[in-house]
Amino acid sequence: MNTPNPRVAKLADQIRVVVAETLERRVKDPRLGFVTITDVRLTGDSRDATLFWTAMGTDKEIAGTEAALESAKGMLRSTVGKRLKLRYAPTLTFVRDATPETAKSIEDALARAAASDAEIARRSQGAMPAGEADPYRHSDEEE
């Protein structure tokens, strides 16, 4: 993937800040839980922004948060356009970020591997190698 245009990267970061502040201060939807905007990806022409988000809670609460984000999308778009003084405010698409779930599965796999290593180490204590104590030939020995 090419490195993004520095202006587009800066604009994406500004959009993330504006949306996060607006969600915290202006959106009063009770379905909106504790939401974190983790990343914003902006197209090269700055017309479409994909906002990745995470939220804490049960599946039902997260579904409510998703619905609240969708219903606030228009207000958030106009706020982004006004605060950043953009001629064209980008369309906002909210996508739930799967990073926390992925990190959890990786942590679980690492914990299983560590437990397996500990079990192997426990079993190998006091074990003797198969064959002779020193299986290598030495030059001082007769053949």
Swiss-Prot record:
Any one GO CC term of the record: cytosol
GO molecular function: ribosomal small subunit binding
Keyword match Lipoprotein: no
One GO process term, biological-process aspect: maturation of SSU-rRNA
Region feature (Disordered): 117-143
Alphabetical list of Pfam families matching this protein: RBFA (PF02033)
Main location: cytoplasm
Basic and acidic residues bias (residue ranges): 134-143
Keywords for this protein: Cytoplasm, Ribosome biogenesis
InterPro entries: KH_dom-like_a/b (IPR015946), RbfA (IPR000238), RbfA_dom_sf (IPR023799), Ribosome-bd_factorA_CS (IPR020053)
Cellular compartments annotated: Cytoplasm
Subunit details: Monomer. Binds 30S ribosomal subunits, but not 50S ribosomal subunits or 70S ribosomes.
Family of the protein in this entry: Belongs to the RbfA family.
NCBIfam families named among the record's database cross-references: rbfA
Function field: One of several proteins that assist in the late maturation steps of the functional core of the 30S ribosomal subunit. Associates with free 30S ribosomal subunits (but not with 30S subunits that are part of 70S ribosomes or polysomes). Required for efficient processing of 16S rRNA. May interact with the 5'-terminal helix region of 16S rRNA.
Protein name per Swiss-Prot or TrEMBL: Ribosome-binding factor A
Higher taxonomy: Bacteria, Bacillati, Actinomycetota, Actinomycetes, Propionibacteriales
